[in-house]
Amino acid sequence: MAKTSWTPGQQKVIDTRDCNLLVSAAAGSGKTAVLVERIINRITSENSPINIDQLLIVTFTKAAAGEMRERIGAAIEKKVLEQPDNVHLQKQLTLLYSAQITTIDSFCLSVIRNHFHTIDLDPSFRIAEEAELMLLKSDVLATLLEEKYEEGAEDFLEFVECYSASKSDEPIENFILKLYQFSQSYPYPHEWLEEREKDFLVETAEDINQTSWMKQLLQYVKAILREASDLCAKAIEITNYPDGPKPYLDALLSDQEIIERLLNSDAGSQHSYEEYQDAFSNITFARLSTKKWPDATEERKEEVKAIRQMVKKILSDLSDDFFFQPMEDMLTDMRKVRRPMLVLLSLTHDFLERLDASKEENNLVDFSDIEHFALNILVTKEDGNLVPTKVATEMSEQFVEIMIDEYQDSNYVQEYILSSISKVTRGCPNVFMVGDVKQSIYKFRMARPELFMEKYEQYSTEEGLYRRIDLSKNFRSRAEVLDSINGVFEKIMTKAMGGIEYTKEVSLYPGAQFPEIGMDLDNTSFLFSDTKTELIILDLKEEEASIPDSMDRLDVMALEEDAIELSKRELEAKAVAMRIKQLVHGERGFSVTKRNGEEQDLKRCQYRDIVILLRTMSGWSETFTEILKQEGIPAYSDTQTGYFQTLEVKTVLNYLRILDNPRQDAPLTAILYSPIVGLSAEQLSFLRVKPGKGAEKLSIYDAARECALNYLEIQDEVTQPEETQPVYDSIIQADLMYEKSSAEKTVSMDKNLIETGEKLKRFFATYDKLREKAIYLPVHEIILEFFKETGYDLFVYAMPGGEQRRNNLNLLVQHALSFEESSYHGLFQFIRYIERLLKFEIDYGEAGGLSENDNAVRIMSIHKSKGLEFPVVILAGMGKQFNTMDAREKIVLHADYGIGPECIDYQLRTKCPTLLKQVIKKNIVLDNLGEELRVLYVALTRAKEKLIMIGSANDANDVFDKWRQDSTPGVTPLRFQTLAMAKDYFSFVGPAALYDSRIRVITLTPNDLLEDEYEKQTDIKNKQEELNPYNFLQSFEEESDEQSDEERSDEERSDGEQSDGEQSDGEQPRKDLLTKLSFRYPYEHEAMLPIKTTVSELKKLSQQVDEELTETFTQVKDELTKTWPQVDEELTEKYPQVEELIETSPPVKEESQMLIEPTIPKFLKEEKELRGTERGNLYHKILELIDFSDNKTKLNLREFVSQLANRGLIQEESISSINFERLSRFFESELYQRIQIAYQKGYLYREQPFVIGIPVREISTQKFVRTTQAQASSILSKNEDFSHANLCSCPNSQDYENDDLVLIQGIIDVYFEEEDGIVLVDYKTDAVGELGEEELIRRYQEQIRYYERALNQLLDKTVKEKIIYSFSLGKEIRIKS
């Protein structure tokens, strides 16, 4: 392998020693590889090698730490192979697993474990789970506020009156929790809170002007005024153009004078708010001259007017937002809010102390505690300064160098911890820091990118004790991708917006080599196969959006209007699906680079090469996953949302809720309506409207209990026997009287009460048993008992997506186990725990279905994609507005500027914003926009070869107009005010991309999406409802009811006919008596149902039963007819399928016709002969592994089979059993040509396993019905006491209950997709008799039917053809539906 070639910048990073080194490493610059090489260089240095455990290597995540340790280990092993006698290197391998390659949390934890005694900490502490900690905080807060209410202090009640919600203290709780979170990012939380108290102790204008927030405001105002001045100068310049409106010049000069006066007067001093306020309140704009100017064009006039309007709006907004009141009014407001804000800060102090006490009581710590405990061990205060402790000094001697990865995500506490164990304070800087401030996206975790920027600006690029090295060469992406990213960010990323100026020094430069892809010069085509970055706008306006001449139009086939209504997200997902199909399956689909060592080539883009990035997953990933699957695109979404919203988890949680407290109408109703009980909507309403005094006032629980009790009472009356009579007098008469009495009472029952009561009786029997156990069982065992008693886990496993649903339930059991390890216990606390998770939107994400190794499109959040790379990146949701909720609260909070409240007079019921709130609000918005800008940078830099950005807009014309207004060709960067007003990613990218030839801007309309060349003309929604298992069950109930009605009608007609004399008087009583005497348990066949079976078993049993029925049915029927002549007609009517089977079965050969073969012992048989099943498996294995991309000859096939044998995939001795003539005939067939086309398009699927749930009622003439009938016939035909009633009462398909589901599993040989549906193919190697095709069809049509059912149910697509390919016959056999 060739030696790695490092760039000059990378080599500097590797070699630089004895200084604090900050490495600004751009995306894809190979920082991890460089860091590993630096470490290896340090431990293998010829001059002064060190041990690996003398380095402290701090990474951001455990995964990164694991990867780093693995890379270092591999590099050391490589060195050992080069120098096998090097004892030092061998020692490093031993030390590697004890070396400090760790996250900051793990390092702090090790500090605490080793030095807990220095801070008087119990070493047996446990790290609290997030949800457990959340419950603890909730309990502490609730107790604190309850005590404050009991005390009834006036200032507390005033605070609550002003800032709480009308029916809840939730806003106050949120304020306290957020202040607590901010305080934890500082070394000493209580001190930070005390600093915030000082913000409200201002008394004079001097006090106000000295605050940090006022200084920041004045700097911001000056920056905006300079931008207004530039705009004004631009307008003046236009008036001097030959076609400019010169009469406007006077007004513009007046505007310029106003702005310059604001900038250059005493208002620029530190005591300037009053002067600014006075100046803004006295601004008067001159009117534009109406004088005609013959050379002036309307376009220039409108341009000047637009610019002037922007200037006036800038000044007006500054005045309205910040200079809306004199200083005295401001001071008055600050005095008014002082008392309630001091109450809030006091509550936060109390909460912090009580929470610490509660955690100490439960011996718990959280990650914030771990950092602060480590800080207390390593740092102490002396004369107001932070200095290292003795422990820190000792530890600093242990480490030769401290290496910090992802330094841009550090906070102040971490900075103090790592600085304390460095040698910086002793004049020997030894800290290595690597990161990229442009990728700092963890503001919500209180990351402080300012730490990085302070050093970035202070450290020199020259040699010295504090040095900076920039790595800007990108080894990840194509030049086209990098050029477009640079083109965007050089216009939108500035020091004020994003934290760093996007200059040439920080731009991305291509460092990787890629094979060339042919450019698509036909820009009118809707299939772009080049690497040009795309910005797609989905125009949701009804009429067509106009498109600038400089843009390309995505020209898809014009189609008629479709009435389907889809949401914005669904339409956007459809647009993404269409683009993915074009990339993967289009005539000129996209190609990606395939690397094999140092060699690289192009390959067709696959689904696994594509990732869809989303800013937020909640609500978006579900929609995209669903739409992509509907479009036939496999999609994998590794989301941390959606778990608690899955049907199966919601159902189990609702059951747990009613186990804890049944008098909760909502969860109880959900359970009654679920398949666990199965009440219909009509039956639920019956519980509320059934006759009875006060029924409508009962709770659902009481009404259900009453209904079940009423049903039991009536049932007792029906089944209670009459007064005993001598059975010897007339047993037949007694039976008839009993039957008549029962029938009359049953008919008198209320139908609703019977049906509802029966279901409720079963429900309460299970519920009462579980509720008793819930008192003493742990939660996870309660859930398992619930599964055992109800079988609900098996039910959901039989539903579509059953594997994932069952995984979700198993995950719930695991969460219950984890909960039991916390400080909370019992069912009630577990439900509280879940409710809190739901309230704070903490979700676990569904258990995995597809995995990241499957050929599927990935859907993930931008945050989760950080550090990853993908050949094709689609950034969706470009038009989704940014979240600004934290800037719209009554009290806004900022880590640097503290608390910004509204001034509320609860007596006068008035409120107004304080200046402090306005300043903090503006800073929150700007900070959030800077964060969004960096998130966007992370998203775009994930792309290796193709970058696509897509979003929707209500009106593309308006969007384009806004972009034109905000952008000026050649001007870099965009105006700060433009960036500060951004509402979404379109607002950032659009103006930057508008005039950039490196980005293709495309518009789509909904009509372009509803029917493209891949659109399937199906009503997806209706198909989903049809395939819903609950709807299946409901349809079976209705079918059963209809059949029962028909049977009753037939019986009534039959009775009527018999009364006319067609049946003898004595025959019916005899028949009834014999039926009663031969009574069999009515649910015997249900008791025999297996939970799971296979398609092969069903087919095999079907064949066995066919033979058995054919042989016995006629004999039994003949025997019965001797005694009861009418039995022939009854059996034929009840089992027409058996009669049909007898008629269509092949004739049984006479004994003389049968070929008698001598029996040969197995050990004398030739080993090369394979049994039919083994030969079939061999053919299947070959067809599973063979490449279908080209035609095959017998020679090709022999070579391929030999390769399989050499690789151990098949037995070499089995090759002689292959008929290559028959095998090659398959590759010459028309079917293979279709398979080959599907394979090339990626639409061929081989050896696909499945598991589906099918109601046993649908498994007609198969295992459960026919086996029982065959067994009954066989047994009873040999029994002298045989009664024909037994045979006639054998179970038929309609005898099974609606909810009897059987799991059926199988493996489909092959299926492929064509434009109008799925083609199902089954390979058969069976020898075929005289009947040929008919024999194969009869033998396998039921098996194929189950395969078809599986594909319909699991893929939600139609099977248009079912084909058996017989290798014996060498032809395709089509099975009709």
Swiss-Prot record:
Compositionally biased intervals (Acidic residues): 1036-1065
Looking at the record's lineage, which domain of life comes first?
Bacteria
PROSITE patterns in alphabetical order: UVRD_HELICASE_ATP_BIND (PS51198), UVRD_HELICASE_CTER (PS51217)
Cite the residue spans of the region called Disordered: 1036-1072
| Keywords attached to this entry | ATP-binding, DNA damage, DNA repair, DNA-binding, Exonuclease, Helicase, Hydrolase, Isomerase, Nuclease, Nucleotide-binding
Q: Per UniProt, where does ATP bind?
A: A25, A26, A27, G28, S29, G30, K31, T32
Per the record, the GO terms for biological process are: double-strand break repair via homologous recombination
Cofactor(s) required, per the database record: Mg(2+)
Q: Can you give the residue ranges of the UvrD-like helicase ATP-binding domain? A: 4-478
GO CC aspect terms: cytosol; DNA helicase complex
The record's section on NCBIfam families has: addA_Gpos (TIGR02785)
Function, as annotated: The heterodimer acts as both an ATP-dependent DNA helicase and an ATP-dependent, dual-direction single-stranded exonuclease. Recognizes the chi site generating a DNA molecule suitable for the initiation of homologous recombination. The AddA nuclease domain is required for chi fragment generation; this subunit has the helicase and 3' -> 5' nuclease activities.
Q: How does it assemble?
A: Heterodimer of AddA and AddB/RexB.
Q: What's the protein here called?
A: ATP-dependent helicase/nuclease subunit A
Q: Which organism was this protein described from?
A: Lachnoclostridium phytofermentans (strain ATCC 700394 / DSM 18823 / ISDg)
Q: Which gene encodes it?
A: addA
